[in-house]
A protein has these predicted regions:
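C-terminal substrate-binding/catalytic lobe of Rossmann-fold NAD(P)-dependent dehydrogenases
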Residues: 132-138, 148-316
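Glycine-rich Rossmann-fold phosphate-binding loop(s) that bind the pyrophosphate
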Residues: 10-11
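Rossmann-like NAD(P)(H) cofactor-binding subdomain of soluble oxidoreductases
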Residues: 86-153
Protein backbone atom coordinates (compact mmCIF):
# COMPACT_ATOMS: atom_id res chain seq x y z
CA UNK A 1 0.00 0.00 0.00
CA UNK A 2 1.46 3.37 -1.02
CA UNK A 3 1.42 5.50 2.13
CA UNK A 4 3.95 7.23 4.33
CA UNK A 5 3.75 6.86 8.09
CA UNK A 6 5.95 8.68 10.60
CA UNK A 7 6.32 7.40 14.16
CA UNK A 8 7.60 9.70 16.88
CA UNK A 9 9.14 7.73 19.72
CA UNK A 10 11.33 4.64 19.28
CA UNK A 11 10.51 3.03 22.60
CA UNK A 12 8.89 -0.38 22.93
CA UNK A 13 5.53 0.79 21.56
CA UNK A 14 6.87 2.96 18.73
CA UNK A 15 9.38 0.36 17.55
CA UNK A 16 6.82 -2.44 17.68
CA UNK A 17 4.38 -0.33 15.67
CA UNK A 18 7.12 0.23 13.07
CA UNK A 19 7.83 -3.49 12.89
CA UNK A 20 4.15 -4.42 12.67
CA UNK A 21 3.51 -1.85 9.94
CA UNK A 22 6.45 -3.21 7.96
CA UNK A 23 4.99 -6.71 8.04
CA UNK A 24 1.40 -5.83 7.11
CA UNK A 25 1.71 -3.96 3.80
CA UNK A 26 0.09 -0.87 5.30
CA UNK A 27 2.88 1.59 4.47
CA UNK A 28 5.44 1.92 1.70
CA UNK A 29 7.51 4.39 3.74
CA UNK A 30 8.12 4.49 7.49
CA UNK A 31 10.05 7.20 9.33
CA UNK A 32 11.05 6.57 12.95
CA UNK A 33 11.99 9.66 14.96
CA UNK A 34 13.40 9.72 18.47
CA UNK A 35 15.38 12.14 20.61
CA UNK A 36 17.83 9.24 20.95
CA UNK A 37 18.81 8.98 17.27
CA UNK A 38 21.06 6.00 17.91
CA UNK A 39 18.15 4.04 19.41
CA UNK A 40 15.98 4.81 16.38
CA UNK A 41 18.79 3.77 14.03
CA UNK A 42 19.21 0.48 15.86
CA UNK A 43 15.49 -0.29 15.71
CA UNK A 44 15.36 0.55 11.99
CA UNK A 45 18.39 -1.62 11.20
CA UNK A 46 16.85 -4.55 13.06
CA UNK A 47 13.57 -4.18 11.16
CA UNK A 48 15.20 -3.63 7.75
CA UNK A 49 17.25 -6.80 8.02
CA UNK A 50 14.03 -8.79 8.14
CA UNK A 51 12.34 -7.10 5.20
CA UNK A 52 14.05 -9.33 2.64
CA UNK A 53 11.37 -11.87 3.52
CA UNK A 54 8.58 -9.41 2.66
CA UNK A 55 7.65 -6.86 0.02
CA UNK A 56 10.13 -3.96 -0.32
CA UNK A 57 9.57 -1.04 2.05
CA UNK A 58 11.52 2.12 2.90
CA UNK A 59 12.30 2.51 6.62
CA UNK A 60 14.56 5.25 7.97
CA UNK A 61 15.56 6.77 11.28
CA UNK A 62 14.94 10.41 10.52
CA UNK A 63 14.36 13.91 11.79
CA UNK A 64 11.23 16.05 11.72
CA UNK A 65 11.87 17.31 8.19
CA UNK A 66 11.81 13.68 7.00
CA UNK A 67 8.13 13.55 8.01
CA UNK A 68 7.22 15.78 5.06
CA UNK A 69 4.26 14.44 3.05
CA UNK A 70 3.38 11.85 5.69
CA UNK A 71 -0.14 10.46 5.45
CA UNK A 72 -0.17 9.53 9.14
CA UNK A 73 1.93 10.66 12.10
CA UNK A 74 1.82 8.42 15.16
CA UNK A 75 2.94 10.01 18.42
CA UNK A 76 4.13 7.55 21.08
CA UNK A 77 6.61 9.78 22.94
CA UNK A 78 6.45 9.95 26.70
CA UNK A 79 7.75 8.34 29.85
CA UNK A 80 6.32 5.58 31.98
CA UNK A 81 5.09 6.32 35.48
CA UNK A 82 7.88 6.19 38.06
CA UNK A 83 7.53 4.85 41.63
CA UNK A 84 6.01 7.53 43.85
CA UNK A 85 5.01 9.72 40.91
CA UNK A 86 1.43 10.95 40.92
CA UNK A 87 -0.78 10.67 37.86
CA UNK A 88 -0.82 14.46 37.60
CA UNK A 89 3.00 14.63 37.68
CA UNK A 90 3.23 12.01 34.94
CA UNK A 91 0.61 13.84 32.90
CA UNK A 92 2.42 17.18 33.10
CA UNK A 93 5.74 15.58 32.16
CA UNK A 94 4.27 13.94 29.08
CA UNK A 95 2.33 17.09 28.18
CA UNK A 96 5.61 19.01 28.26
CA UNK A 97 7.17 16.46 25.91
CA UNK A 98 4.18 16.76 23.57
CA UNK A 99 4.40 20.56 23.62
CA UNK A 100 8.06 20.35 22.55
CA UNK A 101 7.25 17.98 19.69
CA UNK A 102 4.12 19.57 18.27
CA UNK A 103 5.39 22.74 16.51
CA UNK A 104 8.12 20.93 14.58
CA UNK A 105 6.09 17.94 13.46
CA UNK A 106 3.04 20.01 12.48
CA UNK A 107 5.29 22.32 10.45
CA UNK A 108 6.77 19.34 8.64
CA UNK A 109 3.51 17.46 8.06
CA UNK A 110 0.54 19.86 8.26
CA UNK A 111 -1.77 17.67 6.19
CA UNK A 112 -1.16 14.36 7.96
CA UNK A 113 -3.65 12.52 10.12
CA UNK A 114 -2.33 12.50 13.69
CA UNK A 115 -2.78 9.41 15.83
CA UNK A 116 -1.94 10.02 19.49
CA UNK A 117 -0.86 6.93 21.43
CA UNK A 118 1.11 8.52 24.30
CA UNK A 119 -0.49 8.14 27.73
CA UNK A 120 -2.65 9.38 29.31
CA UNK A 121 -3.98 9.21 25.77
CA UNK A 122 -7.25 11.14 26.21
CA UNK A 123 -5.52 14.09 27.84
CA UNK A 124 -2.67 14.01 25.34
CA UNK A 125 -5.19 13.99 22.48
CA UNK A 126 -6.97 16.96 24.06
CA UNK A 127 -3.72 18.89 24.48
CA UNK A 128 -2.60 18.19 20.92
CA UNK A 129 -6.00 19.31 19.63
CA UNK A 130 -5.69 22.58 21.56
CA UNK A 131 -2.08 23.46 20.68
CA UNK A 132 -1.57 22.09 17.17
CA UNK A 133 -3.93 24.44 15.33
CA UNK A 134 -4.98 21.57 13.07
CA UNK A 135 -8.57 20.77 12.07
CA UNK A 136 -10.11 18.30 14.50
CA UNK A 137 -10.79 15.73 11.79
CA UNK A 138 -7.02 15.24 11.50
CA UNK A 139 -6.61 14.30 15.18
CA UNK A 140 -7.57 11.14 17.00
CA UNK A 141 -6.27 9.21 19.96
CA UNK A 142 -5.98 5.44 20.25
CA UNK A 143 -8.53 5.75 23.07
CA UNK A 144 -10.23 2.52 24.09
CA UNK A 145 -9.43 0.55 20.94
CA UNK A 146 -7.23 -1.78 22.98
CA UNK A 147 -9.75 -1.89 25.85
CA UNK A 148 -12.48 -2.89 23.40
CA UNK A 149 -10.20 -5.56 21.93
CA UNK A 150 -9.59 -6.91 25.43
CA UNK A 151 -13.34 -6.99 26.03
CA UNK A 152 -13.95 -8.98 22.86
CA UNK A 153 -11.10 -11.29 23.81
CA UNK A 154 -12.67 -11.91 27.23
CA UNK A 155 -16.13 -12.52 25.79
CA UNK A 156 -14.68 -14.80 23.14
CA UNK A 157 -12.94 -16.91 25.77
CA UNK A 158 -16.06 -17.05 27.94
CA UNK A 159 -18.48 -18.06 25.20
CA UNK A 160 -15.95 -19.95 23.07
CA UNK A 161 -16.97 -18.04 19.97
CA UNK A 162 -14.91 -16.20 17.35
CA UNK A 163 -14.21 -12.56 18.17
CA UNK A 164 -15.51 -11.58 14.73
CA UNK A 165 -19.02 -12.45 15.96
CA UNK A 166 -18.76 -10.06 18.91
CA UNK A 167 -19.72 -6.39 18.77
CA UNK A 168 -19.01 -4.87 22.16
CA UNK A 169 -17.14 -1.74 23.17
CA UNK A 170 -15.48 0.10 26.02
CA UNK A 171 -16.36 3.81 26.33
CA UNK A 172 -14.91 6.75 28.24
CA UNK A 173 -11.29 7.29 29.14
CA UNK A 174 -8.52 4.79 28.59
CA UNK A 175 -8.20 4.36 32.33
CA UNK A 176 -9.95 3.83 35.63
CA UNK A 177 -13.32 5.39 34.69
CA UNK A 178 -13.80 3.42 31.49
CA UNK A 179 -16.95 1.32 31.32
CA UNK A 180 -18.78 -1.19 29.15
CA UNK A 181 -22.14 -0.02 27.73
CA UNK A 182 -23.79 -3.43 27.82
CA UNK A 183 -26.88 -1.96 26.15
CA UNK A 184 -24.90 -1.98 22.91
CA UNK A 185 -23.05 -5.29 23.36
CA UNK A 186 -24.09 -8.00 20.91
CA UNK A 187 -23.02 -11.49 19.91
CA UNK A 188 -24.23 -12.69 16.52
CA UNK A 189 -26.98 -10.08 16.47
CA UNK A 190 -28.43 -10.67 19.94
CA UNK A 191 -27.60 -9.12 23.30
CA UNK A 192 -24.98 -10.79 25.47
CA UNK A 193 -27.64 -11.85 27.99
CA UNK A 194 -29.84 -13.28 25.23
CA UNK A 195 -26.90 -15.15 23.79
CA UNK A 196 -26.20 -16.72 27.18
CA UNK A 197 -29.81 -17.92 27.40
CA UNK A 198 -29.56 -19.34 23.89
CA UNK A 199 -26.43 -21.26 24.80
CA UNK A 200 -28.12 -22.66 27.92
CA UNK A 201 -31.09 -23.85 25.85
CA UNK A 202 -28.66 -25.66 23.57
CA UNK A 203 -27.33 -27.53 26.58
CA UNK A 204 -23.99 -25.74 26.82
CA UNK A 205 -22.26 -25.86 30.20
CA UNK A 206 -21.71 -22.13 30.58
CA UNK A 207 -21.87 -19.54 33.33
CA UNK A 208 -23.57 -16.14 32.99
CA UNK A 209 -21.27 -13.20 32.40
CA UNK A 210 -20.01 -11.53 35.56
CA UNK A 211 -20.10 -8.02 34.11
CA UNK A 212 -18.11 -6.39 36.88
CA UNK A 213 -15.43 -9.08 36.63
CA UNK A 214 -15.29 -8.56 32.87
CA UNK A 215 -14.74 -4.82 33.37
CA UNK A 216 -11.97 -5.58 35.85
CA UNK A 217 -10.40 -7.95 33.32
CA UNK A 218 -10.38 -5.16 30.75
CA UNK A 219 -9.07 -2.49 33.14
CA UNK A 220 -6.47 -4.61 34.92
CA UNK A 221 -5.00 -6.52 31.96
CA UNK A 222 -2.45 -3.83 31.20
CA UNK A 223 -1.24 -3.72 34.80
CA UNK A 224 -0.99 -7.50 34.95
CA UNK A 225 1.09 -7.61 31.78
CA UNK A 226 3.39 -4.86 33.06
CA UNK A 227 3.87 -6.65 36.38
CA UNK A 228 4.84 -9.85 34.56
CA UNK A 229 6.95 -8.61 31.62
CA UNK A 230 7.59 -4.92 32.26
CA UNK A 231 5.59 -3.29 29.46
CA UNK A 232 2.73 -3.71 27.02
CA UNK A 233 3.40 -3.24 23.32
CA UNK A 234 2.21 -6.13 21.13
CA UNK A 235 -1.55 -5.66 21.54
CA UNK A 236 -1.45 -1.87 21.45
CA UNK A 237 0.72 -2.01 18.32
CA UNK A 238 -1.72 -4.37 16.62
CA UNK A 239 -4.58 -2.03 17.54
CA UNK A 240 -2.76 1.03 16.20
CA UNK A 241 -1.82 -0.72 12.96
CA UNK A 242 -5.42 -1.81 12.43
CA UNK A 243 -6.47 1.81 12.81
CA UNK A 244 -3.76 2.89 10.36
CA UNK A 245 -5.10 0.43 7.80
CA UNK A 246 -8.51 2.12 8.11
CA UNK A 247 -7.02 5.59 7.73
CA UNK A 248 -5.21 4.74 4.49
CA UNK A 249 -7.99 2.64 2.98
CA UNK A 250 -10.77 3.72 0.65
CA UNK A 251 -13.54 2.82 3.07
CA UNK A 252 -14.76 4.01 6.45
CA UNK A 253 -15.21 2.07 9.66
CA UNK A 254 -16.41 2.58 13.22
CA UNK A 255 -13.91 2.54 16.06
CA UNK A 256 -13.64 3.65 19.68
CA UNK A 257 -11.03 6.35 19.14
CA UNK A 258 -10.61 9.33 21.43
CA UNK A 259 -11.85 12.58 19.87
CA UNK A 260 -13.14 15.95 21.01
CA UNK A 261 -16.71 15.99 22.31
CA UNK A 262 -19.09 18.73 21.17
CA UNK A 263 -22.28 18.16 23.11
CA UNK A 264 -22.74 14.45 22.41
CA UNK A 265 -24.43 12.84 25.43
CA UNK A 266 -24.28 16.30 27.04
CA UNK A 267 -20.46 16.35 27.13
CA UNK A 268 -18.30 19.24 25.91
CA UNK A 269 -14.61 20.15 25.59
CA UNK A 270 -12.93 16.86 26.45
CA UNK A 271 -11.52 13.97 24.45
CA UNK A 272 -12.72 10.46 25.20
CA UNK A 273 -13.89 7.34 23.38
CA UNK A 274 -17.32 6.68 21.93
CA UNK A 275 -18.23 5.18 18.56
CA UNK A 276 -16.60 7.26 15.84
CA UNK A 277 -16.60 6.93 12.08
CA UNK A 278 -13.05 7.09 10.71
CA UNK A 279 -11.61 6.78 7.24
CA UNK A 280 -9.08 8.24 4.80
CA UNK A 281 -10.14 11.78 5.75
CA UNK A 282 -9.70 11.08 9.44
CA UNK A 283 -12.56 11.63 11.86
CA UNK A 284 -15.88 11.75 10.02
CA UNK A 285 -18.17 12.10 13.03
CA UNK A 286 -19.66 10.38 16.07
CA UNK A 287 -22.02 7.45 15.71
CA UNK A 288 -24.74 7.62 18.40
CA UNK A 289 -25.25 4.40 20.31
CA UNK A 290 -28.34 3.80 22.38
CA UNK A 291 -27.37 3.78 26.05
CA UNK A 292 -29.47 3.69 29.17
CA UNK A 293 -29.46 6.54 31.69
CA UNK A 294 -26.94 4.85 33.99
CA UNK A 295 -24.49 4.33 31.13
CA UNK A 296 -24.75 7.94 30.03
CA UNK A 297 -24.02 8.99 33.60
CA UNK A 298 -20.94 6.74 33.59
CA UNK A 299 -19.73 8.46 30.44
CA UNK A 300 -20.23 11.87 32.07
CA UNK A 301 -18.35 10.66 35.14
CA UNK A 302 -15.45 9.66 32.92
CA UNK A 303 -15.51 13.07 31.23
CA UNK A 304 -15.52 14.83 34.62
CA UNK A 305 -12.51 12.80 35.79
CA UNK A 306 -10.55 13.83 32.71
CA UNK A 307 -11.58 17.48 33.04
CA UNK A 308 -10.37 17.49 36.63
CA UNK A 309 -6.88 16.54 35.45
CA UNK A 310 -6.98 18.93 32.49
CA UNK A 311 -7.82 21.83 34.82
CA UNK A 312 -4.58 21.23 36.73
CA UNK A 313 -2.11 20.96 33.85
CA UNK A 314 -0.12 23.80 32.31
CA UNK A 315 -0.83 24.15 28.59
CA UNK A 316 1.34 27.24 28.12
Amino acid sequence: MSSKITIIGAGSVGATIAYTLSSQDIASEIVLIDINKQKAEGEVLDIIQGTCFRDPISIIAGDYEDAKDSDIVIITSGIARKPGQTRLELTQTNVNILKSITPEIVKAAPNALYLIVSNPVDIMTYVFTKISGLPENQILGSGTILDSARLRCGLSEHFQIAQSNIHAYVFGEHGDTSFIPWSGAYISGVSVDEYYELEKKLGKDIEPIDKEAMLQYVQKSGGEIISKKGATFYAVSSSVCKLCSLLVSYSESISTVSTMMHGEYGIEDVCLSTLTLVGPNGVQGKVPMRMNKAEIEQLKKSADALKEIIAQIDLN
